[in-house]
């Protein structure tokens, strides 16, 4: 079975952790493009429930682009979010989780940090950002960005 990753999946799983502090520098344009293309090509999970994912990332010199997407202070200097929306089909949460984790592992392979956010974000603002329709919900989002060089208190919360 071929994978879209440059490293074995098991290695990426071991490498990935919940990154809560990021550099203020936005994700580079090339990595944004690669991640957006991967997201566009991997929208479903193994059970086929409809899910949608998108990258919302700040451009160079435009850190304010993500202002107002509330994460209650758990994440420092996020320069991007992986947004996801899903309908109300059977096995939808399984498909959502599978697809989101595959995207997260790709981001890890690009050298980016990520952190799942399930209950510590303002769902209505993220739903608006991904244009979720009335039958869709946003169960989780993931912060993404360049990993901060110096780990602080938030980072010490990771297992």
Locations of regions flagged by a protein language model:
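Acidic, surface-exposed loops and disordered segments
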Residues: 1-159
